[in-house]
Amino acid sequence: METTAILLLHCPDQQGIISEVTKFITDNKGNIVYLDQYVDKVDGMFFMRIEWELEGFLIPRDKLYDYITTLYAQRYKMKFSLYYSDKRPRMAIFVSKMSHCLYDLLARWKAGEFNCDIPCIVSNHEDLRYVADQFGIPYYVWSIKKDHSNKEEVEKAEMELLKKEDISFIVLARYMQIISDEMIAEYPHHIINIHHSFLPAFIGAQPYHQAYERGVKIIGATSHYVTAELDAGPIIEQDVTRITHKDTPESLVLKGKDLEKIVLSHAVSKHIQRKILTYKNKTIIFS
């Protein structure tokens, strides 16, 4: 498979952006293999994802970022990110005691669905070490006291591990701890959470029990980027399933677990493929 460059950009909408960027690529012998764009009419913003093959491309990789900055970013007031398909993201998974999302992520990774590396799994409990062992992934445990008196110390150790392993992004696979503002600042829009409800409904703990008490007719799951405000980050993926008055809190939990696995895996896949742009508190998901 040919190595490709992936350019994600957004800027105020104006005439000629697509033409300028595609001409720059083709004039330098790049073969464009993907292009998707969107205009937000309300805010007047332009968003684009473009990918091209690097074989025969005239501009060296170590110069490309500077070229784009000089030629287009300043001129169009453009913000952009540049990635390469042969540089695999490195994902850390954080878990607590529930295994369903962890198993699903690791099975998909083992099957080749995720083009990434998983150097470590981090937990606040020993419970899921056997899962990590099955897949040959190092498992690190830092227990957090009930009064959270060692939380800062634990996060410092976790951050040292993440930096040592050159982690690109973090997935909270039902990790039942609140991430500090300091860690979020180190990985802005690079920490993915799965919340077991159709946000913004039923935030916080036990959403399935909240849904049962409310008598809702659908339940859902939401994957989002983590921000300082609990369960309020940019939403990446959501799904729902219908329920009836015959469902119990226990049956809702079982149905919800299936949703959580699907929604989280889709969000992770889109992040790995560089198909997500964040703007304000929303995401633009490219096809």
Labelled PLM ranges:
Residues N124-H125, S149-E153, E165-S287:
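Donor/substrate-binding cores of folate-linked one-carbon enzymes
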Residues S85-D104:
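Short, low-order "capping/linker" segments at domain edges
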Residues D133, I137-E165:
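Adenosine-nucleotide cofactor-binding segment
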Residues K110-A111:
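Conserved mixed alpha/beta catalytic, RNA-binding, or beta-rich assembly cores of soluble enzyme
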Residues C116-D127:
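Short internal beta-strands
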Residues H10, A92-F94, V122:
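Short hydrophobic segments within beta-strands
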Residues R129-Q134, I184-E186:
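Short loop/helix-cap segments at secondary-structure boundaries that form the rim of catalytic
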